[in-house]
Amino acid sequence: MGHVTDIRSNSQGFNLTDSVYERLLSERIIFLGSEVNDNIANRLCAQILLLAAEDAFKDISLYINSPGGSISAGMAIYDTMVLAPCDIATYAMGMAASMGEFLLAAGTRGKRYALPHARILMHQPLGGVTGSAADIAIQAEQFAVIKKEMFRLNAEFTGQPIERIEADSDRDRWFTASEALEYGFVDHIITRAHVNGEVQ
């Protein structure tokens, strides 16, 4: 029969049976490590609101390794980030694609980071339409509105002209960390984090 090893730290009181994500949350670190869907959005929104209520002035760190996902779910996360009174630092690790890119760039200006080998993908919002001809027309109209708004916000986040955002989003556009820095998705490339929370 196997057994669980319980290793405790005298300074932190941390043991291997603790939930990693709960431990990170206690340090004001939240993690988007999957496709963006309603369940993930509800969890992240709740975590942001909780941390903002606990301390309205201390930063929240959002780490992103995501292929993207639902536009409505992603916009719920974005609106909650804007609602929070504290700064939200964003970190790209692995892949920040589509809605992952959007949330990365939506972080507090000056506090958006990429790890050296992170990859960032920008493209047009994707959305399928079904139903009757009238329903399809309504959905297509709404999708056009959302697409225009996301182009506008990405232009605001990056400082790029909206015309360039539209042109570069026409097809999948991948960025290295250095290219993402130059484009304006992030403000820093980091290689090391210190115990006190500072980054290099």
UniProtKB/Swiss-Prot annotation:
Q: Which domain of life is it from?
A: Bacteria
Please provide, alphabetically and separated by semicolons, the GO molecular function terms listed in this UniProt record: ATP-dependent peptidase activity; ATPase binding; serine-type endopeptidase activity
What keywords sit in the KW lines? Cytoplasm, Hydrolase, Protease, Serine protease
Q: Which SUPFAM superfamilies match?
A: ClpP/crotonase
This entry's Enzyme Commission designation comes to 3.4.21.92
Indicate the enzyme's highest-level EC class: hydrolase
Cross-referenced InterPro entries: ClpP (IPR001907), ClpP/crotonase-like_dom_sf (IPR029045), ClpP/TepA (IPR023562), ClpP_His_AS (IPR033135)
One Gene Ontology cellular component: cytoplasm
* Catalytic reactions of this protein: Hydrolysis of proteins to small peptides in the presence of ATP and magnesium. alpha-casein is the usual test substrate. In the absence of ATP, only oligopeptides shorter than five residues are hydrolyzed (such as succinyl-Leu-Tyr-|-NHMec, and Leu-Tyr-Leu-|-Tyr-Trp, in which cleavage of the -Tyr-|-Leu- and -Tyr-|-Trp bonds also occurs)
What GO biological process, any one, is recorded here?
Answer: protein quality control for misfolded or incompletely synthesized proteins
Q: Where is the active site?
A: 98 (nucleophile), 123
List where in the cell it is found: Cytoplasm
Per the record, the similarity remark reads:
Belongs to the peptidase S14 family.
- HAMAP family registered for this protein in UniProt: ClpP
What is this protein's function? Answer: Cleaves peptides in various proteins in a process that requires ATP hydrolysis. Has a chymotrypsin-like activity. Plays a major role in the degradation of misfolded proteins.
- Quaternary assembly: Fourteen ClpP subunits assemble into 2 heptameric rings which stack back to back to give a disk-like structure with a central cavity, resembling the structure of eukaryotic proteasomes.
Q: What is this protein called?
A: ATP-dependent Clp protease proteolytic subunit 1
User: What is the organism of origin for this protein?
Assistant: Mycobacterium leprae (strain TN)
Specify the taxonomic lineage: Bacteria, Bacillati, Actinomycetota, Actinomycetes, Mycobacteriales
